[in-house]
Design a protein with these regions (language model features):
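C-terminal accessory helical subdomains adjacent to catalytic cores in phosphodiester-
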Residues: 2-11, 18, 25-36, 43-159
Length: 159
């Protein structure tokens, strides 16, 4: 992606969040060519404070490493493009709401429909947490449900 002088590179690294951070901090990884690195993970029922601390330790004078945590899962961000999030008890609740909003079957629940309303990013940023809560700060793990995805999109100039 290249947007008004901002370029983005997406790299998929398989494994749990701490494995991802370890790989990015390893000898074969050079983050110095980037001003910012954003690592997007799901909460998945596990505390991610250790992951966020390791992201901060990866930062240098040249590169800031941010951790984005979606609680309980990334479907919180997707759901917010369609409607306000609900008070999900867990990942299964958020995923059921996603299927309800998109009409996807259980078999296709990890797919993105062709008609995702990506143009509703501003609305999604306001709806990705409960009305009684505020958007969690950058590099934090918010309450359930919430996500810090809006901070990444603001950094990219998309919000």
């Amino acid at each position: 992606m290249n947007h008004d002088g901002i370029s983005a590179k997406v790299k998929v690294i398989k494994g749990d969040p701490l494995t991802v951070v370890k790989q990015l901090g390893g000898p074969r990884s050079d983050l110095s060519e980037y001003e910012e690195v954003w690592i997007v993970v799901d909460h998945d029922g596990r505390d991610r404070h250790d992951f966020l601390a390791k992201c901060r330790r990866l930062s240098s004078k040249r590169t800031v490493v941010h951790g984005v945590v979606s609680v309980p899962c990334f479907e919180v961000w997707l759901n917010a493009h369609y409607a306000p999030v609900k008070n999900y008890r867990n990942q299964a609740d958020a995923q059921a709401h996603y299927r309800e909003l998109t009409g996807l079957s259980s078999k296709d629940a990890k797919m993105l429909p062709d008609d995702v309303p990506w143009d509703r990013g501003v609305q999604a940023a306001a709806r990705c947490h409960l009305p009684t809560d505020s958007l969690p700060e950058t590099d934090t793990q918010g309450p359930c449900p919430s996500t810090t995805m809006p901070h990444l999109l603001r950094s990219l100039g998309l919000l």
